[in-house]
Regions:
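Alpha-helix boundary/capping residues
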Residues: 29, 52-56, 192, 231
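Active-site regions of metal-assisted phosphoester/phosphodiester hydrolases
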Residues: 1-24, 79-267
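N-terminal, active-site-proximal structural segment of metallo-dependent hydrolase catalytic domains
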Residues: 1-52, 67-73, 258
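Structured beta-strand-rich core segments of catalytic domains in phosphoester-bond hydrolases
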Residues: 33, 37-118
Length: 267
């Protein structure tokens, strides 16, 4: 099975011509399953994939949270294999940011963890507090731990390295959230029961999956895009397709997205 995870950077909308280019890039990679974040709802993107034989989940049937209402974007799954859409975990403030489906014997989730800790003025305006972000991380961990044969990938936002060198953490500004968040991140990224499929690609010398352009530490490397598996019986290879992030159009703008897609191949 070939799974492509990609934040297509559609939170503020994608013009139709660029949507067509992104779909063409996906078709060139030829994944069986596509896990998407920042899908612009009502803009025809999922319908464009459906025209090429991909069944898609329906994120707009879930309740609208404040963030989605503001940005009109969601996480979604598209599959050329038979797929049954499942409900997102209970307790999410933004259920449209967590799409779940069963494909064969595998349960797969596409998630977008709310961006809350690094941009406090924006977070406050949108009703996003660090606690909401931590809760989404907590639900992601509970979902992975809740059944065999589960795989989750998506944009986790705002990465930060632990001082002791463990793979990756996620910054929290409030002390009350920090310890709770790091415990959850340890469960996601550094546990024996969950495999961090792309953690070996996050050395400081490696190409990032996203350049952080704003906030307190702009113009630095970031690995926002992750894949995690709770199935020890299945091996996955992981490769970032950085060329799709670095590709530029004639105006020097990103041709596709400011995130590198992550290709997973299961054996």
């Amino acid at each position: 099975m070939r799974i492509l995870n990609w934040n297509i950077h559609g939170a503020s909308g994608i013009r139709p011509a660029k949507q067509a280019e992104i779909i063409a890039a996906i078709l060139h990679v030829s994944p069986d399953v596509v896990l998407l974040q920042e899908v612009p709802l009502g803009a025809g993107f999922l319908e464009g994939l459906a025209a090429h034989g991909y069944a898609t989940t329906e994120p707009d049937k879930h309740p609208i949270g404040l963030w989605e209402n503001k940005k009109k974007n969601a996480a979604a799954i598209a599959s050329r294999l038979p797929m049954t859409e499942l409900s997102p975990p209970e307790g999410l403030r933004f259920p449209r940011l967590f799409s779940v489906a069963r494909i064969g014997g595998l349960e797969i989730a596409s998630c977008h963890i709310p961006n809350a800790s690094g941009f406090n003025s924006v977070a406050k305006k949108l009703g996003l507090t660090p606690d909401i972000k931590v809760t989404h991380l907590e639900r992601a961990l509970a979902w992975l731990d809740g059944g065999q044969g589960r795989l989750l990938a998506g944009d986790f936002n705002e990465p930060d390295f632990f001082r002791d060198g463990r793979a990756i953490g996620f910054e929290a500004t409030r002390a009350a959230d920090r310890d709770r968040q790091r415990t959850i991140v340890d469960g996601l990224m550094n546990s024996d029961s969950i495999t961090h499929l792309c953690g070996h690609l996050h050395a400081k010398s490696d190409e990032p999956s996203h350049w952080i352009k704003s906030g307190p530490h702009p113009d630095r490397k970031g690995w926002f895009d992750h894949a995690l598996s709770a199935n020890k019986g299945r091996a996955w290879s992981a490769t970032y397709l950085h060329e799709l992030r670095s590709s530029r159009d004639e105006e020097g703008k990103e041709r596709y997205s400011d995130h590198s897609p992550l290709l997973l191949v299961g054996s």
